[in-house]
Amino acid sequence: MDKLALQFENGLKDKMLRAKKECKYNPTRFNQMLAQYGGVETAKRLISNGITTGATSDGYTTLYLCGRLDLTMEHSVCKPEYRDLFTSEEICYCNNLMGVK
């Protein structure tokens, strides 16, 4: 795993811990996916599912209801420093969820 992908994954793990503490949300399936696929592939799989089905992930919905979209995986994908890890379609999908025009 390259340095940027590792940085992305570690950021997701930090957000996961904050979500558990601040929103009482334990993203068990997301944690399992991180362990199995790594951060970038997990994000790509969840984004692909969202694009295909038109439905957001359970984690996104839970954090939205908690008022903490800053803790979502989609928020991380939108960060300029991680743009090289994702396609323009994946970034556009996440920007739309974040309300970025």
Question: Which stretches of residues belong to each language-model region?
Answer:
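Charged, compositionally biased N-terminal leader segments and the immediate start
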Residues: 1-22
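Short, well-ordered helical secondary-structure segments
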Residues: 3, 21-24, 30, 73, ...
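Functionally constrained cores in energy, signaling, and assembly domains
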Residues: 9, 15, 31, 42-43, ...
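Compositionally biased terminal segments of proteins
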Residues: 10-13, 37, 55-56, 88-101
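Amphipathic alpha-helical packing elements
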Residues: 16-68
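Amphipathic alpha-helical binding modules
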Residues: 64-101
